[in-house]
Every structure is written in structure tokens, then in C-alpha cells.
């Protein structure tokens, strides 16, 4: 694709760090909630695993998976001592100076080895800016924080405007060991900040984490983020408007991440955890920032030319340092049996993986994170860690084996293992490992009660208990050292009614934070289920996308809008989300699959749930059976073509085979049917995926159901919500399907391809016809979207419905012998193409009233329908049908 850059579009990526999909609601997040109503909702979104900030920042920036970017976690093994991390070989890379250290070691001074959206847009004449959280902001255009004169030099003024925690105007402080130097600003930006009444140094973040006896913060990061929002709306965007060039901007809100991490609502207890008032305040803070940006766009008219994608880098979980399940079973880890200052008795200390492995292997352990800069970076001795003396790695990282030395930039060749501790998952490197040693380490880890899933470098071959890194997009063209193993920690739910509730997820975490505070990084659905939505002139309105999407899809989608062909080195790339774009398909075909490793000698196997759209894969959950929230493992499987009757227990997973099966489901089931004509009865918190037959799915037939999704697949299917006490999702997919809501509100029905029939007998439901010639029936206060094709939309007698026909010659039946109780709305009537159906009513009874830009169609004093954007004088008798409805 050639670069076009001719449509005058601007793009903004708004990242609400750590925002969970389920945290969006009308009260806490009115702005985010309104985008879901007016723009595009991505109902099946994904963070990339490991679910940390900088990895997903690299995916958002470049559109590549982590196997290409080499940004495997917030803390990685670099293979060399980082001068700006006190000589550590395991630096925390949310730090501009450390990013500069790493960049310097790789081709093009770009450790990602991929072009980012901002970098390429900048090269094509766009104005570019990245504002907000230290670390991920710089990654959006990472070469801009490289220093002149090596690691002790200074950062030149970047072409991309970068304002993060350490930016301090035109004269940054000299580089200090262990802390980043400031990114300088162009004098024009400095002057504009001062003219707007803003300091050239960002407001500092003040959110203490506390300790094991002192609660952390009770306040959101309001002041700092208000500075960032003001800098964006009062300085950067006005400058971009004055310049008259298209722009690309990334705004990275530290909240709710920082508030959820450090909150003091739940010290040492699992509830409320990250669902307390401080976390909610952090969520609200991010929503307020987004509102300020969107309000500016609207007030200046930029909303007409600016597309906005909202995402979060990852979800979030409450930390457990002792309990490994909802029953309170305590970990048996060796590390938890020792006594440490600042750690509660029986709790896991930071560094428990390194301590346990060193103990199991009988090898010495060293701490690779010095607290001060060594006098000679060419000769570093890391401190010994002896857990029996109450010692632990300060940040959780560990060097195991050898002498713990770094000589002339090289880690001691006797080193057996390097552990990069991160939180909900850890990276393990075997600098001199072989397949036999890797297998030994896998065997040891598989016996730990806090482990749930292991992934191993493909170079070691198949190892029982582990899946290859390539299975989750971690083996590609990366230039940084590739982890030998990635280990996922156990997750569980504190919701007694739903063990797979991502909003109630708790995870074991290798972190210095306390039990009850917040963390992420795991392969549980609570961490992979981020929040993604979009709004703007190139995105559909009121569209719910049920296809899988991820952070790696953000840049390809925006590049498609901007007409940019961004060059790439690796092949692990996301996709343009074409179904969400105006003129794109109504839906794309996706598949769900399960991959399971061989078992270890103790019976553990790693299972991966993933989805695919074409060749693009999305990783939903992974781990050991029963140890990961949201993980699907088959409890029952029928491979025959016989017709089976199956009754499921709560939370079981079933694959039926290819017969004509009858499945009596329960709560929390995941059901895959085969090619036969199947009947499935299912309850709450379940997922149903039917195969190629003409299937029937009944939701809530035995008791009211909520939080259930049914996908009809191929065939002419009937999916019915019998009774609901919460939202459910119906997806017809291919075939001529019938989707019906008998009783329920806020149900979502999507016909997909084929000539479908969608019915609402409840209220406040949303029906999407998709492609094909569809029939949609509303009742009261429903929203109907016909999509492509010649559709027929019926307004129910209750009225208050909103009808959008989409492409094609559509019919809007507003009355059929009886009048609606309240006015309906037609949003996109096309004179001379579409028809208004008024069965049993004569033309002489109609009155057409102009009300602003809209036409009100009345009979007497009864308003039947408002035709938005239609002049009453443009309507003719040919725009109406007065015979009886085509449907009796």
C-alpha cells in the first residue's frame, strides 16, 4: 500500500493504563460508556501476554507481537549491565534513561527493531506527540529518547513532543545513576506551557505504596494527570491546529493502574482488593482526562477529522501472597517458610521464584539490582542472597549459580539462571542452558502450587508440561535476549457464584507490593481482558464488534485510516480491524481453539485458549487445569457421530462431536458442538459455540440467565433468550438465523451473514442484522441496526425505538393497524430508496411537521416517528407504504 496521507485525518490513541473491561459503566466512567453507545465497542478484546505495560506499549506503538519487539515484560534480562539502572542486567524499563541504554546496544539505536506509528507518521510530515506515563510514552517513538554521547550524554530535543513524569523543559538535569534524565522540550512548547499557566516540569505523582503494616494511597493520581491533560488541550493540540498539519498523538493515562497498584483500601485482605473506592477513583480520573480531550476536539471541530481509539494495556488483579485459591489454602513454597523484614509470616516475599529455584537446585543466589551505582561498571559483584538469614532480592530478580559477577559487560559464564520478576508472571533465562536443564527447571516449576502454565523457547524442543513460546507470539524477530521460559502464576476468583469472573480475579504475584493491592501480568482473563473502544469519522456508530481484537491491532487500524504503509522487519503483526470501519464488513469470521501440552510426570499440562481471525491469533487465557480464571479445558468430549444426551455440572466444558446432540447446561459452562443439528439449554456465565448444523440454543430456559454468549456458527440456527436477569450476547454468524429475546433487557443480538430474523419482546435491547436481507423486530426502547442488504425494521407497539437501516433499500414499519405508544426514531432514512411503512393508515391522516433538521410524522396528536436529517418538503407519497405489513 502506498502512502496516501491525503484524507486530512488525525488520530489519537488514548490508553487508560490497567482499565478492566468490566469497570466501564455509566456512573464511574460516563465518557467511556458513552463511546460504547455512540462508537465502536470491542467486546472481545485482548492484552498481549505477558500482560504488562511496556510489552503492550510496544505492541500499541508498532502493531507487532512481542516476539518481534523483544519487549517481553517491564523487567527483562538485557545481557549487559545498564548504567542507568546501577549496573543491573535485569533493569525495570519504565524509565527513559534505561530505554536509552538498551537502544544503544541494538541496530538503529532501536531495541524494538520495528517502526512505530508515531515515528513513521513523523517521517511523513505529521505532527506527533506522546504524553503521560513514564516509559510507555517514550516507547511510542523510542529513538527520540536516545542520548548524544552515549549513556552519559544528554537527550537532544526530540521532534516528537514527549511529556512524561521526568520532562522538565529546555534544561534537563544531568544524568543521575539509577534515575532518568529529563526529556527536553522545544522552546516553543516551553513558552506555550508558561503562557497557559503551566510549569515546564510536570506535577509529580504522590501515591505512596505503603508496606506490610501501613496502607498505601487513598487518592487517585489526579493532580499529575490534570497537568498532562492541560498540556495536551491547552498547548499541544492548539499548536497542532495552528500548524495545519495532520497529527498523531498518544495520551497515556497512568490511572487507574497507579491507583490500583498502590491503593490502601485492602491491606493484606483479598476483598475489596482493587474493587474499592481508591481504584474506582482512579478509573474515574482516567475517564475525566478522556472527557477533557474529547470536549476539546468537539469544541474546535477537530472531532470531524480525528479518529480516537481507546485501549488499555492490560487488565488487573488483586494480589495474593499466601492464599492460592478461594478457600484460603496456603502456599507450600519454601520461600514462604522463611522470615523476612517487611514480609508477613507465611507470605511469599518478592523474589520467591528465585529463592525457590536456588534452594531446589542447591545453587547460590545473587541480587542483580544494586541499590547504588558500582564504582566500576566493568567489574560488578552482585550481593549474595541467603533466605535463611532473612535476605531476599530487593526487586525480586535473581541470578542463580556462578559468582554473581559482571566482568567487562559479561555476566559470569557460570550463571545457570536469571529470573526477571515482574508480577503475575516471570521471565526465566538460561544463559548456558540446554534442553535437559530446561526440562529439569520445568519439572521443578510444575510442582509449585503457585504456577499455572509454562512456556518454553522453541529452541529446546518439546518439553512435557510446557507449550512453545511460538504458540503465544513470543518467538519472532526480537533482538533482545529471548526468555528460555515464561511462567504464569495462579489466578482465582473471589466471586462465589462465578469462578471465572475477571472482575474478581486474584493472582499470585512476584512483586514488592502487598497482598490486597493490585498487579497484572498473568494469563488469567482478568488480566488479558482489557478495554478497547473507538469513535470518530472513520469508525462505525453504535457497533459492537464480537470478533477478537488486541493491542497489536491498534496501529494497523490507524495506519489504514491514515493511508500509511509502515515498514516492518518481523512477521508477527496485528490486523486492521476493518469490520469496525465505515464501509467495512459487518463482521469477520473468527474461530476458537484449545491447545494443550503433554503432561509432566506429576500430571500437569499447559492449556492455551486462543482465537483466530485469518492468520492473526488472540490469546485469551492459559495455564494448568483449574488454576487460571477464564481458561477452557475440556471436561467432557464426544468424538463420535452418534446423538448424545448430556447433562453438565456447573463450570464444565464440553465438546459434543458431530451427532445431533441434546445438552442440558448449567452455570459457567463452555460448550462446543459439532456438525449435527444440536439443541443446547444453558444458564448464566456460559459460552456456547455451535458448529455447522441447524442448531437451537435456549438461554435462561430453566432460570433467568446473564453473562452468557451464544455463537451459532454455520447453519440456520435459532438462538433464544427465554428469560434474562442481566445482559447476554447472541451471534448468528453464517446462515439464515433467528435470534429472539422473549424476556430481557440490554440483550445484544448480531445476525451476521445470511438473511436473519431478530426479535425483541423485551426492552432496551440492541439488534444488529449484519449482511444479508434481514428482518428486525423491536418492542420498547430498542435499537435496531439493519446493516448491509435490503432490510425490514419493525417498530413495536411500545414505541421509543431507534431504527437505523444501513446500506441497501430498507423498510421501516412504524405502525400496522395500531399506533405506537411513543415516538420512534429513524436515523438514516434515504428518500427515494427506503420506505416508511404505515399499515392500515391513509395518507390523508398524516401530518408532516418540520422540527429543526428532522421531520415528525404524526396522526392527530400522536407522533409516530422522527426522521432525522430529513426535510418534510422533500418527502413524497412514494416514500410511504400504506398497505398491511409484509409480515402478518
Give each language-model segment a name.
Residues 65, 72-247, 252-266, 420, ...:
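His/Asp/Glu-rich, glycine-adjacent segments
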Residues 643-844:
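Acidic, glycine-rich calcium-binding repeat modules characteristic of RTX/beta-roll
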Residues 50, 76-83, 88-104, 292-307, ...:
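Secreted, luminal/periplasmic, and some membrane-associated catalytic domains
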Residues 452-486, 546, 564-599:
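Polar, surface-exposed loop/tail segments
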Residues 8-21, 34-36, 60, 121, ...:
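Beta-strand elements within well-structured catalytic alpha/beta cores of enzymes
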Residues 66-69, 145-201, 271-288, 329-372:
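Acidic, His- and aromatic-enriched active-site or binding-groove loops in soluble protein domains
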Residues 1, 636, 845-888:
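Low-complexity acidic/polar repeat-biased segments
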Residues 22-71, 75, 127-131:
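Short, structured active-site-proximal loop/turn typified by the sulfatase FGly-forming signature C/S-X-P-X-R
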Amino acid at each position: 500500500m502506498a502512502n496516501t496521507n491525503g484524507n486530512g485525518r488525525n488520530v489519537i490513541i488514548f490508553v487508560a493504563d490497567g482499565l478492566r473491561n468490566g469497570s466501564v459503566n455509566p456512573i464511574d466512567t460516563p465518557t467511556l460508556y458513552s463511546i460504547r453507545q455512540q462508537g465502536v465497542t470491542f467486546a472481545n478484546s485482548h492484552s498481549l501476554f505477558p500482560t504488562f505495560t511496556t510489552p503492550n506499549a510496544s505492541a500499541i506503538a508498532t502493531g507487532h507481537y512481542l516476539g518481534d519487539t523483544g519487549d517481553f515484560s517491564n523487567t527483562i534480562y538485557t545481557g549487559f549491565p545498564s548504567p542507568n539502572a546501577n549496573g543491573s542486567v535485569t533493569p525495570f524499563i519504565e524509565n527513559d534513561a534505561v530505554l536509552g541504554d538498551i537502544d544503544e546496544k541494538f541496530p538503529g539505536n532501536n531495541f524494538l527493531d520495528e517502526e512505530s506509528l508515531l515515528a513513521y507518521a513523523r517521517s511523513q510530515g505529521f505532527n506527533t506527540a506522546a504524553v503521560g506515563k513514564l516509559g510507555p510514552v517514550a516507547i511510542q517513538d523510542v529513538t527520540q529518547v536516545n542520548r548524544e554521547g552515549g549513556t552519559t550524554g544528554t537527550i537532544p530535543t526530540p521532534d516528537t513532543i514527549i511529556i512524561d513524569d521526568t520532562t522538565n523543559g529546555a534544561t534537563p538535569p544531568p544524568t543521575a545513576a539509577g534515575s532518568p534524565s529529563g526529556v527536553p522540550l522545544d522552546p516553543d512548547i516551553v513558552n506555550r506551557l508558561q503562557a497557559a499557566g503551566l510549569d515546564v516540569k510536570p506535577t509529580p505523582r504522590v501515591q505512596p505504596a505503603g508496606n506490610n503494616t501501613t496502607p498505601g494511597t487513598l487518592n487517585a493520581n489526579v493532580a499529575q494527570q490534570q497537568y498532562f491533560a492541560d498540556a495536551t488541550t491547552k498547548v499541544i493540540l492548539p499548536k497542532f491546529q495552528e500548524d495545519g498539519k495532520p497529527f498523531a498523538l498518544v495520551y497515556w493515562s497512568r490511572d487507574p493502574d497507579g491507583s490500583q497498584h498502590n491503593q490502601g483500601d485492602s491491606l493484606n485482605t483479598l476483598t475489596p482488593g482493587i474493587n474499592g473506592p481508591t481504584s474506582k477513583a482512579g478509573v474515574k480520573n482516567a475517564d475525566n482526562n478522556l472527557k477533557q480531550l474529547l470536549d476539546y476536539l468537539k469544541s474546535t471541530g477537530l472531532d470531524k477529522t480525528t479518529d480516537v481509539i481507546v485501549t488499555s494495556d492490560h487488565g488487573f488483579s488483586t494480589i495474593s501472597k499466601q492464599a492460592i485459591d478461594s478457600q484460603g489454602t496456603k502456599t507450600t513454597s519454601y520461600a514462604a517458610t522463611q522470615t523476612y523484614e517487611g514480609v508477613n509470616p507465611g507470605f511469599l516475599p518478592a523474589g520467591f521464584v528465585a529463592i525457590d529455584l536456588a534452594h531446589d537446585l542447591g545453587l547460590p543466589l545473587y541480587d542483580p539490582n544494586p541499590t547504588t551505582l558500582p564504582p566500576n561498571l566493568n567489574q560488578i559483584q552482585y550481593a549474595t542472597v541467603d533466605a535463611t538469614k532473612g535476605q531476599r532480592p530487593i526487586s525480586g530478580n535473581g541470578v542463580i549459580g556462578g559468582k554473581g559477577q559482571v566482568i567487562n559487560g559479561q555476566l559470569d559464564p557460570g550463571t545457570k539462571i536469571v529470573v526477571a520478576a515482574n508480577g503475575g508472571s516471570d521471565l526465566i533465562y538460561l544463559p548456558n542452558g540446554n534442553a535437559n536443564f530446561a526440562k529439569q527447571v520445568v519439572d521443578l516449576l510444575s510442582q509449585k502450587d503457585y504456577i499455572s502454565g509454562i512456556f518454553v523457547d522453541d529452541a529446546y524442543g518439546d518439553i512435557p508440561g510446557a507449550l512453545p513460546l511460538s504458540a503465544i507470539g513470543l518467538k519472532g524477530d526480537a533482538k533482545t535476549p529471548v526468555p528460555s521460559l515464561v511462567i504464569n502464576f495462579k489466578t482465582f476468583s473471589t466471586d462465589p457464584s462465578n469462578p471465572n469472573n475477571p472482575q474478581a480475579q486474584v493472582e499470585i504475584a512476584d512483586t514488592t507490593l502487598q497482598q490486597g493491592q493490585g498487579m497484572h501480568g498473568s494469563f488469567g482473563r482478568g488480566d488479558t481482558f482489557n478495554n478497547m473502544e473507538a469513535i470518530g469519522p472513520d469508525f462505525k456508530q453504535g457497533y459492537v464488534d464480537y470478533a477478537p481484537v488486541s493491542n497489536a491491532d491498534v496501529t494497523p487500524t490507524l495506519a489504514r485510516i491514515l493511508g500509511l504503509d509502515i515498514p516492518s522487519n518481523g512477521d508477527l503483526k496485528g490486523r486492521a480491524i476493518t469490520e469496525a470501519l465505515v464501509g467495512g464488513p459487518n463482521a469477520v469470521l473468527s474461530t476458537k481453539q484449545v491447545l494443550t501440552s503433554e503432561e509432566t510426570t506429576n500430571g500437569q499440562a499447559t492449556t492455551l485458549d486462543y482465537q483466530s481471525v485469518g492468520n492473526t491469533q488472540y490469546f485469551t487465557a492459559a495455564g494448568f487445569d483449574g488454576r487460571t480464571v477464564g481458561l477452557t479445558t475440556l471436561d467432557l468430549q464426544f468424538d463420535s457421530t452418534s446423538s448424545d444426551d448430556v447433562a453438565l455440572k456447573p463450570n464444565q466444558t464440553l465438546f459434543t462431536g458431530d451427532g445431533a446432540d441434546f445438552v442440558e447446561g448449567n452455570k459457567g459452562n463452555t460448550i462446543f458442538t459439532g456438525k449435527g443439528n444440536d439443541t443446547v439449554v444453558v444458564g448464566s456465565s456460559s459460552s456456547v459455540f455451535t458448529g455447522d448444523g441447524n442448531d437451537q440454543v435456549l438461554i435462561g430456559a430453566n432460570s433467568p440467565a446473564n453473562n452468557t454468549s451464544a455463537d451459532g456458527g454455520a447453519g440456520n440456527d435459532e438462538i433464544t433468550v427465554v428469560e434474562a436477569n442481566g445482559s447476554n450476547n447472541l451471534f448468528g454468524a453464517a446462515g439464515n438465523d433467528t435470534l429472539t429475546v422473549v424476556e430481557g433487557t440490554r440483550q445484544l443480538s448480531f445476525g451476521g451473514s445470511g438473511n436473519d430474523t431478530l426479535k425483541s419482546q423485551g426492552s432496551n435491547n440492541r439488534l444488529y442484522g449484519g449482511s444479508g436481507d434481514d428482518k428486525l423486530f423491536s418492542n420498547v426502547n430498542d435499537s435496531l441496526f439493519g446493516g448491509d442488504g435490503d432490510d425490514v425494521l419493525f417498530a413495536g407497539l411500545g414505541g421509543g425505538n431507534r431504527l437505523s437501516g444501513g446500506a441497501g433499500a430498507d423498510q421501516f414499519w412504524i405502525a400496522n393497524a395500531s399506533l405506537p405508544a411513543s415516538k420512534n426514531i429513524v436515523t438514516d432514512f434515504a428518500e427515494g430508496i427506503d420506505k416508511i411503512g404505515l399499515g392500515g393508515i391513509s395518507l390523508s391522516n398524516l401530518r408532516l411537521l418540520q422540527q429543526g433538521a428532522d421531520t415528525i410524522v404524526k396522526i392527530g396528536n400522536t407522533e409516530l416517528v422522527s426522521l432525522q436529517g430529513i426535510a418534510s418538503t422533500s418527502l413524497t407519497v412514494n416514500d410511504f407504504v400504506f398497505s398491511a405489513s409484509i409480515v402478518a
